[in-house]
Structure formats: structure tokens, C-alpha cells
Amino acid sequence: MVRNMDLYRRSACDRCRRQKLRCVRPLKHGACEHPNNIEALEPCERCSRAGTPCVSTLPPPRKLSRVERLSGLTSVGQLDNLPLQPLIPKQASSHRPGSGSAKSCIPPTGQNKGINDANAVTGSLSMPLPDHRSGSNVHRQPEARPLKRRSRDIHPFGTGSPPTELLDAPSFSTRRSPIFSQAEPFALNDLDFAMQPHSGGDLPSHGDDLFADVLFSPHQKPPAGPTVGESLFDNTKAQELDTRECCLRRLTSLSSRLFHDFNNTNSVKLPDLLSFSPCRNLTAPNQATDCPQNIIGRVLESSHTFLDILHGLAPDPRPTSSSDSECSYSNYWEDDEFVPISDEMTYNSTSARPEFRDSSDMCASSSNRDSSDLSAASPTIDMPTTLTILTCYTWLLQAYDTIFSQIYSSLLAGTDSTSPSMPPVLPGLQIGGFSLDQHCDLQIEILIQLSARMLDRIEGKLGVTDTKDSNAPVDDQEWSRNGSILDTASASTILDALFKQNHSETRAKPGKGARAGSVRNIMKNIRAELTVHK
């Protein structure tokens, strides 16, 4: 009876079906043996009451679903002709623990042969389509998408057979799609989002779009960055320390060499001072050859070496602020004068206007503050290094004093004769082919100019320049005030004490004049003597 009721509900006439009404059609007498036949039904009650013929025609054929269409295709063996694309590598299941073998447990048939061949291509792991197959029957769930829609053009080499060198290519990729085992049914515990490198081999040089997440090869190491606690400026600081230590070693070696060369020059006459002797070249200490030099050449070379060492020990003249101007615009007013403006209820044009100070005073204070900040930030010279520097400077001054004293004595000795004898202090000197061997006065003038300029630069670097007695240019004097490495007061005091012990005529002259009266006054006297003999 239930079956007959189903037939009543499903065998509606055309009129009731068009009006979407319930159609009740009882069975004809003797038609119980064939309940599925629509012709065995009587006209429905609604058509009988309306007096219209009750007609029941066959409905149009229903469209097949995608699952039914695919089932029909697989039944006639058309699955092999579909343009399937590789979805999962063949070796993906072999690297998973517990997967058994790399080969699939499903026997190869004509229906799944194309899928097994296409799955052997190595590529980027995308979301594969789970296949639930038993034997040769292929069944797909209604919720699953068809294989044709799931296939994507991700293989850059076409649909042909993949190259064999890509099967073992390492691929460090973050799997954003789960891995499914072909031997086990699909389950949630089969999802694997771990990073799993493939076995051995080098990265391919082509097909880079397959390895979108490749970082580094196993044979390559990423560039090492700064570790925890390591500063980016450690290397620069280490280089500065190495340069400073090298300058200190050179300074110590120069001090001992100056003592060896100029310790006994006070009692030596001028011909012996001007005589050449083999001496080690200080500008190229690595060379084993010796070059002939006299005392003048050694003093000039030692002065150049000493000046080079002072440049290495000098502080870095980088400004502490990013502004390149001498004074800041914010120095022209005071912040305290703007505070009462907002608190006053009445406006006062006299009191509310800030009083600008003198710009020259502010620039001077700003420059003094910058110099103090620079001196505070620069590394200081310790007392042993200061004494070593002043010792080298004293040896050089003593050598210059000895040389020019002997030259001045030779000039004074020749004043009694009609033709004064001027010693050739720079023999073999030529300027553009012009020989100075017969012009001894020009040789002495050149030596004075060169020695005075060298002493000015050294004293400027030390910070002990006497501006009144110095012949240095204005730019050198300004540079000496800004780039000195020693404290001017303490260095001048030590030098004055050293020179007062050796020069009795300058003991009554306090200050820097005692130090300048020994060498520079002799240079002035020599120039005056040369002017008289012209």
C-alpha cells in the first residue's frame, strides 16, 4: 500500500503539475499487478470536477549530474584521454613515515595508468585530489570537484615525460597543501604541513616557478649577519685601535732612532754634518738597501715620519651635530623668555618680544661648545705617549738648532774675507734643469723655507704653535688650533722647562719665546746675513 501511495504522489497529470497542485489518481480496477504503469491510473479528482481531460505526458529527460557523467565516461574507458596534469609527486609518499613503499598499492589498470604516470613529475606541491578506488571501479563523492577542473597548468615542461634529473632535486618548500597517501583512505590525520626537503641532488637551473619557496641549497649557507650583542661598528673600532697601536710602535721606534742619530751632533762641525753616509731609508723600511744621507736629509725625513705619526694619533675631526653651520639659529633667543607669554592675560609688546643677543657672541659660544664636545669625544693621549711625543719633538728641534747654528757660524766666519765661503748645503739640487750648485745662498734659503714649514706643521699638530713668532700661513694656524692632539698649556710648560735648562740666554724670557728663540731666531739671523752679502 505504501508503494501505491508513492505512485499516487509521483504520477501527477499535466494540469496539476503545471498548477503545482496535488494530483490524486486512484488505480483502475484490476491494475494492482502493474502499479508502475501510468496508464493504469484513473483521471484525477480535480480534472474530473473541472470536466477537462486528464492527460499525463512523460517529463523531459533530466540532466545528468557531473558524477553521473564522469561515471559514464569511466565506464566506456574515456578517462585516459583527459588532459590530466601532475598534482602530486610520485616520491611524496615514500618520504612520509609509515607510508610503506614508494609505489602505489593499487594495481595499474587502463583507467588509472595516466594518473600514475602524471604523478611522477616533481613540482611544487599543490592540493591533490584524493582518489578512493577499489580495484577497477572508480567512485567519486558528490562533493568532490571533477578531475578536469582540478587540473592546473603548473608544469612548465608540457605534458611530456619529466626530465630524470628533477626526480631527486632538493626542494625546500613550505607545504601549504596536505599530503595524501595513495595506500590509505583520506583522513584528517593525513595532513602534513611540515618542511620536508627532497633527497640529494642540486637545484635545477630551469623551472624556477616550481620551487617558489626555495631558500638555500644544502651546500650553500646563508650570509652570516651580526650576532646577538655584536655591534656593526666593532670592525671600525678595531681598525682604529690597530692604527693607533701601529702609530705608537712607530713613535717608539722613531724616538730611539732620533737618539741614535742626533745624540752627538752638538760637537760636530759643518763639513761633517754635510758629509753623506749610508743610512736606512725611513720611507721604505721594508727595503734592505741603504741610501746615502747626511744630517740634513735625516732631519727632514724624520720630521716627515713624525708628522705622519701625529696624523695617525690625531682625533677624528667629525662634528657631533649634523648641522654644518657655525652657530645654530636656536642660540639667538632663550627659552625662558617665551614661558611667561602664554601665562600673561594682557598683551605687552615690550615684554612679549624676545631679546636677541649678539650673533657674534653666540657663534663664539657655539664654536667653543663644539670644540669642547669634539675634545671630549676624542680619545685622549696618556702621559707616557705625551712624553714620547715631546721627546721626539725635542730631538728634532735640537737637530735643526745644530744645523742652522753651524751654517750661521760658517757665514760669520766668512765675513772677514772678500768672498765669504757659503757651504753647499743641498749639493746636486736642480729645479727644472737649473742647477743650484753655484748658488749656495739659494740653497740655504730653500732649506730655511722647508725646515720652517715642517716645524710649523709639527707644532700646529701638537698645539704648541706660537702665532706671533710663527711664519706659518693663516690657514695652517687655524688648522693647528682645531686639530691639536696635546693640551696646549701642559705641553708648552714641559717644553719651556726643557729648553730653559739648555739655553741660558732664554731663561729670563718666560713663555713660548724661550722655545722659539733657539731655532727661529737663528733662521732670521741667517736671512739677514744673506741679505748683507748680496
From Swiss-Prot:
Residues 13-54 bind DNA. Residues 109-125 have a biased composition (Polar residues). Residues 88-170, 350-378 are annotated as: Disordered. The keyword DNA-binding applies. Keywords: DNA-binding, Metal-binding, Nucleus, Transcription, Transcription regulation, Zinc. One of its GO terms (molecular function) is DNA-binding transcription factor activity, RNA polymerase II-specific. InterPro entries: Zn2-C6_fun-type_DNA-bd_sf, Zn2Cys6_DnaBD. It is found in: Nucleus. The gene is ccsR. Residues 130-146 have a biased composition (Basic and acidic residues). It comes from Aspergillus clavatus (strain ATCC 1007 / CBS 513.65 / DSM 816 / NCTC 3887 / NRRL 1 / QM 1276 / 107). Transcription factor involved in regulation of gene cluster that mediates the biosynthesis of the mycotoxins cytochalasins E and K. Residues 361-378 have a biased composition (Low complexity). This is Cytochalasin cluster regulator ccsR. GO terms for cellular component: nucleus.
